Amino acid sequence: MPTLLELSSVLPLAELEVGQHFYWQIGNYRLHGQVFLTSWFVIAALVVLSLLANRNLQRIPSGLQNFMEYVLDFIRNLARTQIGEKEYRPWVPFIGTLFLFIFLSNWSGALIPWKLIKLPSGELAAPTSDINTTVALALLTSLAYFYAGFSRKGLGYFGNYVHPTPVMLPFKILEDFTKPLSLSFRLFGNILADELVVAVLVLLVPLFVPLPAMILGLFTSAIQALIFATLAASYIGEAVEEHGEEHAE
């Protein structure tokens, strides 16, 4: 009698395909090559921006240095508000990386004509319009807040699951599964829907009518990056917060 593992290798339990894909075959694994290509582009753009902003540091910032310091202050304030005054500093790089990567990924889908770049198969698109990217970001967030809780409280972190009453245990466990699901599908759905709407409008009315939708897409993309980073910081704040302790104002 075949085992469950053997059946799952023959009959996939679930398969999600949206659009055409460019695959890289590495052994028995098949990777979404177009996601890696666009993700590397976004990462390279962030590295170049960071190097340019730090190339000639001045005591009184101006130009790109001034802009990057403003972004850093914004991310620092976001982390402080959600995590708390005592614990936020170690998490600023993580929250900042999430926000900047998602923000630039979303905007790359709205501003860069990826589909004009021809591939052997499939087509390029924003990294965050692929469910694999958003699920990976959500799982990283889950690992981050688990690590934050354990590093702060040790085994006492499990006390959160039965606070304020043991009746909450199944709901707390369910919450650990729904958090990454909601994070990943919210981001994936919004960015993919925006790209599809703009693509359809461009095909139907290829002149100026799609412009308002594209501008709205830029705004939505920025909001989605902010929501993801805010929720990630909030989950970390919940993990490190002691019972009865409130975030600093």
UniProtKB/Swiss-Prot annotation:
Assembly behavior: F-type ATPases have 2 components, CF(1) - the catalytic core - and CF(0) - the membrane proton channel. CF(1) has five subunits: alpha(3), beta(3), gamma(1), delta(1), epsilon(1). CF(0) has four main subunits: a, b, b' and c.
Name of the molecule in the record: ATP synthase subunit a
Annotated gene: atpB
Family membership: Belongs to the ATPase A chain family.
Gene3D superfamilies linked: ATP synthase, F0 complex, subunit A
Alphabetized Pfam families for the sequence: ATP-synt_A
Molecular function GO labels: proton-transporting ATP synthase activity, rotational mechanism
Function comment: Key component of the proton channel; it plays a direct role in the translocation of protons across the membrane.
UniProt-annotated location(s): Cellular thylakoid membrane
UniProt keyword terms in alphabetical order: ATP synthesis, CF(0), Hydrogen ion transport, Ion transport, Membrane, Thylakoid, Transmembrane, Transmembrane helix, Transport
Transmembrane spans: 33-53, 92-112, 131-151, 196-216, 217-237
Topology in membrane: Multi-pass membrane protein
One GO CC annotation: proton-transporting ATP synthase complex
